[in-house]
Each structure stands twice: as structure tokens, then as C-alpha cells.
UniProtKB/Swiss-Prot annotation:
Protein name, entry field: NADH-quinone oxidoreductase subunit G
Residues in 2Fe-2S ferredoxin-type domain copies: 2-83
Domain of life where this protein originates: Bacteria
Residues reported in the UniProt entry to bind [4Fe-4S] cluster 3: C228, C231, C235, C263
Amino acid sequence: MATIHVDGKEYEVNGADNLLEACLSLGLDIPYFCWHPALGSVGACRQCAVKQYQNAEDTRGRLVMSCMTPASDGTFISIDDEEAKQFRESVVEWLMTNHPHDCPVCEEGGNCHLQDMTVMTGHSFRRYRFTKRTHRNQDLGPFISHEMNRCIACYRCVRYYKDYADGTDLGVYGAHDNVYFGRPEDGTLESEFSGNLVEICPTGVFTDKTHSERYNRKWDMQFAPSICQQCSIGCNISPGERYGELRRIENRYNGTVNHYFLCDRGRFGYGYVNLKDRPRQPVQRRGDDFITLNAEQAMQGAADILRQSKKVIGIGSPRASVESNFALRELVGEENFYTGIAHGEQERLQLALKVLREGGIYTPALREIESYDAVLVLGEDVTQTGARVALAVRQAVKGKAREMAAAQKVADWQIAAILNIGQRAKHPLFVTNVDDTRLDDIAAWTYRAPVEDQARLGFAIAHALDNSAPAVDGIEPELQNKIDVIVQALAGAKKPLIISGTNAGSIEVIQAAANVAKALKGRGADVGITMIARSVNSMGLGIMGGGSLEEALTELETGRADAVVVLENDLHRYASATRVNAALAKAPLVMVVDHQRTAIMENAHLVLSSASFAESDGTVINNEGRAQRFFQVYDPAYYDSKTVMLESWRWLHSLHSTLLSREVDWTQLDHVIDAVVAKIPELAGIKDAAPDATFRIRGQKLAREPHRYSGRTAMRANISVHEPRQPQDIDTMFTFSMEGNNQPTAHRSQVPFAWAPGWNSPQAWNKFQDEVGGKLRFGDPGVRLFETSENGLDYFTSVPARFQPQDGKWRIAPYYHLFGSDELSQRAPVFQSRMPQPYIKLNPADAAKLGVNAGTRVSFSYDGNTVTLPVEIAEGLTAGQVGLPMGMSGIAPVLAGAHLEDLKEAQQ
């Protein structure tokens, strides 16, 4: 700690910080542009000037840039010194000489750091009356709009994109006051994290193009704290709504999880919530048609049918909340509840959970991954299956440069010096996968092989670290040399990290990862292990337990069950579509509860229209076992009284109560959570994921809307001039109104949107943190459900045999895509241009045997259908395998590991 003196007052601060960071952490306002908590200091904008004095007697002082000056013990500075204030105002005036005066038409207006800093410096009159320099804007793809004339040359965009996210296609061109930030030519930004430019840029150069189509100001949107639903990582988000539509998603700061950044799937993949073809009312089949029902009719009709059924089973979903899955389990009984996950995937999920809970190895939070100094990724294409983890791995690898700089006593915020000292030095990263990955550019070595051989590599590494681990026979000398290099790197690391998961389709890969972690722990290393699952609540469903999807289908096929309730699950993704359709056709009653229109609705007798994450509350559990609550953003029935979209748990509990002819006793979310805790002790921690509905601050609920929210009384005037009462939220501590507490200093960690007096942009998160870039002042939201066990597991001993290609037979290797493999986000219209067209990848040798080239269409039979796809040649794919894009149209993820036998060139 250090003692500094600011305008005559004494403060205790972190001596490792610079003065700007220290003052912001104290709640003092210093304007800045080029500095960012995640990017460090370069002193490019000169906006954060303060007056520094030699001692208490010095009255003259000198101007210094606070972002480039350490907060040393005994420092005396003044923020309010007149010369410093005039200098800061003049800097803004320089920047404004070329900045257009277009705030009324700029999409950044009301969410703009430049506006905030201009007001803060007091600059309110423009003296420059001459020609401004202008630029041509670029088309940067479907996600981001580009308006270069608004640029103030703060360099944040390229520092984030190139230095932090390792992007290669955005740069700066030109000189002096005529610089251009963009691509060498028009084209879609290639980085999976390009959307963060929207929040990194302090002006309106980079804005959210998906928001542009239905634009409104930040102060006119309704927000709620939420959790990204597009993968298992559980990033915190702030969805914004207007007129019953999601308009944009912003990053919600969580110092333990996603920090300041999201991936592009999480930021832009929300379009499925706004689809017009979503089920919005319950419907029941009458012959070949569906008739619309109200909620009471739906409940009575469903209950009447279920009463006549001899056995009802329920099929849950890894994309549904803990509460919804539990409500289904209560409806059908624990013994009749099935997870809706394929048997193989469920085995891998249970093993991953066992490793995390009983393995004796620490599981780091997402932010903690950045602190590891050697990383081994076994089997997961992390950028495609858990992209935010990949960004954290990139920071971990860069830790080598920070380590070298620290040895020379260079402060952690001196990023230019760190990059200069590091000269691209990296901590070791080793990656195994069936083919190339997006992390290969920073990897020390990549191993492209079938999953069996990847597992064998992992087992061999574990044995080399600890000879009591099972040995692997038949390792080639060249591969053994690589294993020795990996072992040396992992053994020499203070904090090695092992990353694996369920998406590779191999239980042995997970076992190998666990063995490597155990061997490293035995050598005294501070080792961590991270498991990546498939869906947002895969871990929660795994903890809850239940039979596999195949077991559920068997119940229907044999006639033991004659009614099935399917919860938020497109079963075609987890089993053969032919088998699913045949099994459902045998059931006299098929009830589907979902917020998306799926293929199995063709077999449904009753469809209950449920609410998406934006219209409901619930709890999900991420890949590290962290329970996190998401909250309802808006009530769709407020805009259309015909809409009947209830939370899935509310539908299912109402049905259960109707079936038993009793009063509904779960009238709010807290009642469901209490029931979960009582029945499933392993999930007891979810009660602490967020405060209950009685939480108040000074007697007030928390506001979902900014206090400047406008137009509320006119929003439904086209329907009726009589304004209805605002929706009443009985489930949570939030209110559907601007009338509630939204103070940044209030004792809360669930924050719907970032705003503080004088701070309207995302930089307002500074006001909610205990120190800038640290944790939220009153704790980061969410709670871990299990901690590292003391004992640990024994070594896994089932080493697989080497992969052997078979003539005339090909094994399907899984290829995942950030844009396209996820069930929900692939429905977003904006994603269509970013999704690759379905393909089949072949090794050059296999392509030669078949007599086909790149672009040739080949066909194969699967599930009673003939599939025809164009060939792509993959040099890294081992012969004897074919690669298919998992989750794309007609290519279910359950295909991973299956075999094809009739692959041939398609008839023209």
C-alpha cells in the first residue's frame, strides 16, 4: 500500500497502480481516453493530466499524465488545479477539431465515453471553424458498423484487437492527425471477439450493427442482469429491451468470470428471442391442425390426458434452467425423469463432474485462467466450444512477457514496455485436436490426431510425470520427443492448467486430462483443471441426474410409457431423427414445452409456449460449477395481451397442481428454489446465487430501467389510449420501471446496467468495483457449488488402442463452429452470413482414393436419408476419418464418433 495526497486529502492506495487507476478506485473523477483497465497505459491521448508536486511545500508543481505515473508512497497531486483543468479542456478541444458534431444521429449517444469526458472537462463551445478531415467507412461485416470520422485516435481499438485478442486484420494506417483505423480492405472482421470493439471504443467509430436495425438510446431500454445462454461458460450479460424485443446485449462486468469481454456468439446471437415464428400461445392438435388455447384450457386439457396415461415420462434439457428441469422431475417423478442427453454425452458429463468434484484438483474461474503459466488443451477446440476460455488462454500465454517485465521491476500497467521487453515471448501452450484450431497461432506445439491418439498422448504425459500412472505402449520416438518437451514445460511451471471437455466425444480424453492433472499435483504443482461442457446448464442437469435420452426412447418404443413431456429440447440433436420420430409416434400424448419451434413439434399433441431467458428467471450452472441467476428482462404479455408465454417451471408446476387437484404452491421463483434445495442437497448453494424477492435497498426494489427512460405512457397508445399497469414482478427484487434504486454505491452485486452520475458509457463499471479492474464492490454474483476435495481420484487405467483406419469405412470427427454449432444462436438471422455452409472434410489420401477434389459433392447414407455435401480437403485430418460440422442443419452433434461406409461421389 502507498499513501498519496490528492488536493490536500490523504488516501491509502495500491502502490502497484498508476495514479489514474488509484484515483478512479477511490471514486475520484479524472477524464481519460486511451487507458483501459484491461489494456494498461500508453499515454497516447494526454487527457488524464494532473498537477504533481515534489512535496507538501511545493506550490508550483508540474503537469504529468496520471496513467503513466506510479502511485508511489508520498505522492502529492492535484486534480482540481486550474492549469491541469485548462490543459484537460484543451485536449478535448484538440480532439474535437475533427470530430463531427453529430451526437443526435450517432448511435453511441447516451452511451458515449467521449460525451462523458467532454462534459467532465467543461468543454462546451467549439472555436474551430475550418474544414474537418473525412474518411471513407468500411463494411466490417454483419456485426459492427464503422464510422471513421468520429475517431479521436486513442488507439484503444488496435491495442485491444491486436495486442489483447491477437487479431490480425485490424490496423492503423497514416500519420500525424490523419490516421485510419480499419482493415486493409472491406471485409468481415475475423476475430471471434471483434464485438468488444463496440465497448472498447470510447466514441461512435465501432457500433453494434445488430442494434442499428431497431435502434433506441440506452436510457430508453429496459435491462436485467442475465447469463449468456450460448455455451457452458456462463458469461454475465446485460440484455436491453424495447417494445418487446431484445435490442442489444452488453457485457455485464463480473470480476471473477468474464471481466470486460464477451465472445461474438454471446454478444450478437440473441436474434432467436425475436423470431416471429416462436410459439406464443399454447396449441393443441385437432386432427391435422392446431387450435389455440388459453392458459387454463391448456392446463385442463393436459391434465385430462395425463390422468388417462398409465406412465408419463419427462425429458429434460441442458439449455433449460435448474428450476424448469426440477419442475419436470417433480411432475413425472424422479424415476421417470430423463435428461434428454445422449448416453455417450451423459457418460462424459458425469465423468467431468466426478473429476471436478472428487479429483482433488482446483478448478479455476474464467478470470483465474489468465494467471496460469503453462496450458495443455486436450481434445477441445476451445475457441469454438467455449470461446471466452480461449481469450483467457491467450492472456495466460502472454503472461511470460509480464513475468520478464516484472523481473526488471516494470509495473504491470506499463504495457508498451512489457510488449517491448517480451518480444512475443510466451508461456507454453500445447493443443491437441482432430485438426487445426484457432489457438494454433500461439501454441508451442499442436498435435492433430484421432481422439484415441490424443488420449494416448495424455496418458503418456501423465506416465512421464509420474511412473505410477499407467504406461502407454507403442509410442513412436518422434512423438516421445514431443512428450518429453511437454513434460519438461508442465513440470517446470508453477501453475500448469489442463483443459478438456465433453465435446471431443471421448471419455478417454477426459480421463487422460485428469491423469495429467493428478500427476502434476503429485509433483507439488499448483495445478488447475478446466472442463468445457456443451450447453449453458449441462453441469446443472448432470448434478440433478436422470436417465439418458436412449433410455427414454426405449420406454416409448416398448410401450411402457404412453405419455411424454419434452422440455426445451430438440431431440433430433441428441439421437437419430428417425428413431425419435418413431418413438414419439407411438405415444398417445406428446407434450412439448419450448420457446423455439423445433422439429419434434410436428409430433406434438400439445405445445406449451414457454419463455426464453429474456422473459424468465432461473438458475444455471456453468462449467466450473458456479450457480448463477438470470433475471427476466421484460414481460411479453405487456405488449400483446394475447401472448401466453410462461416460465417452463410455472407451466409444469401448474400442470402438476391441476393434475393433483390442489392449489398452486410455487407462486414465485423462491418457492421453486426452496424445493430444489430440500430435494437435492448438492444444489443447496443455488439459494445464494442471488438475493430473494424480498431484497430491498432503503425500502426500494431495484430499477430495470434508467431514470431517464421515456415514452412509457405512449408505448401502447397504438393499441389503446388507456395505459395498463406496469407488469408486477413477484419473483425477484427488480421492478419493471425506472422507479427503483439504481445507485452505483448501493449494496448489491446484481446490476442490470452500468450507469453512474457523469458516467453513461460502459466505463461506468469503474464506479461499481472495489478497485478498478477488480471485483464488484459488494462481491461478484454467483456461487461455486463444489470446492476442491482433499482426497482425489485414483489414476484412470483404460488406455485406448491406437486408431486404425479401415478400408471402406470412415469415422466421423467432430468440427465445431462458433457461428452455427449452437442450437439457439444459429437461428439468429444475423448469424446466417457467418455460418459456414455444411461440408465434409477429407484427408488428401482419402480424397484421392475416392477420386474427388475440393468442391466435389459426395454422398452418404445416415438415418435412412442420403446426405450430399461438398468436399473440403483437410491436411491435418488423419486418414480414415471424415469431418462434419456439428450442429449444422441435418448434422446432429450425436454423429460424432459414428461410422460411414457408403461414402461416394454424388450423382450429378
